[in-house]
């Protein structure tokens, strides 16, 4: 099910700098959430498993089943929206899993995704947005009022943006000693720039949903791009410092304005 991945020199350098104990393995099959039996197989690789769980009351009554399962005592690795590279600290040592969907992608792009996961895993941050919002997820759900799937998408986007406020400082610092990775970070941002600039018009014309726009804008934060209103309020020290409380307040104000 899992095979150890050989890392390129730039990625190995990032691992040694940020999380030298971290393991990187390829998964045999694609997944959103790793089936529990397969997740348990990680016990053959790592020293210990430490499954996370959260209070059920953090989740609204209409919350998606996948979120309820994540909050339970079921050992859960990976969630919808996590992308092609997944990291977890529910194992000792922590581990990064690479999905086979990345096969055929440009090597430099894959290297950046791996380095990004290593940096994120090294931070003292929750593994998932539920640990970020905690009981405030119910408040976010009430503010967003887009249904379970819409709230999930907005929450994941806001958490991704908050993480980006922390990681982009590290990415920018690579210009001198990990220039290949820094170049991939800049290139990825350049590919997003035009789409981000056109977001207000795309939303106004109904070409992009507000949830999709939030996801794109928040993904641009880690690249240091200029964001249009109302997303620019998320690219601030206030959001970095006040975290989920700021995100909920932003959602409340923003969706109230959209409904006017």
PLM feature spans:
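Short amphipathic alpha-helical segments and their helix-coil junctions
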Residues: 92-98, 136, 140-147, 226-231
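Active-site scaffold of zinc-dependent metalloenzymes
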Residues: 61-114, 118-128
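Internal, well-ordered alpha/beta segment that forms a basic, Gly-enriched binding/recognition surface
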Residues: 165
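Pan-zinc metallopeptidase signature
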Residues: 179-260
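A metal-dependent hydrolase signature that marks the N-terminal structural subdomain at the beginning
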Residues: 1-77, 257-258
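Short acidic alpha-helical/loop segments enriched in Asp/Glu that coordinate divalent cations
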Residues: 127-133, 173-185
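Post-HEXXH active-site segment of zinc metalloproteases
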Residues: 108-109, 122-157, 161
């Amino acid at each position: 099910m899992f095979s150890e991945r050989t890392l390129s020199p730039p990625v190995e350098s990032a691992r040694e700098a940020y999380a030298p104990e971290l393991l990187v393995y390829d998964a045999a099959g694609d997944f959103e959430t790793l089936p529990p039996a397969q997740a348990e197989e990680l016990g053959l690789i790592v020293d210990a498993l430490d499954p996370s769980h959260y209070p059920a009351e953090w989740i609204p009554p209409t919350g998606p089943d996948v979120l309820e399962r994540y909050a339970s005592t079921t050992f859960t690795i990976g969630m919808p929206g996590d992308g092609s590279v997944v990291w977890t600290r529910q194992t000792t040592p922590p581990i990064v899993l690479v999905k086979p969907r990345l096969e055929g992608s440009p090597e430099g792009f894959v290297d950046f995704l791996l380095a990004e996961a290593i940096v994120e895993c090294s931070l003292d941050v929750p593994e998932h947005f539920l640990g970020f919002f905690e009981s405030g997820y119910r408040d976010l759900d009430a503010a967003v009022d887009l249904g379970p799937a819409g709230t999930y998408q907005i929450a994941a986007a806001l958490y991704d943006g908050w993480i980006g406020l922390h990681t982009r400082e590290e990415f920018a610092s690579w210009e001198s000693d990990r220039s290949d990775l820094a170049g991939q970070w800049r290139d990825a941002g350049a590919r997003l720039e035009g789409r981000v600039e056109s977001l207000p018009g795309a939303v106004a014309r109904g070409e992009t949903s507000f949830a999709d726009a939030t996801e794109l804008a928040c993904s641009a934060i880690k690249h240091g791009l200029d964001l249009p209103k109302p997303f620019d309020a998320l690219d601030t020290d206030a959001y970095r410092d006040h975290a989920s409380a700021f995100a909920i307040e932003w959602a409340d104000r923003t969706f109230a304005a959209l409904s006017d």
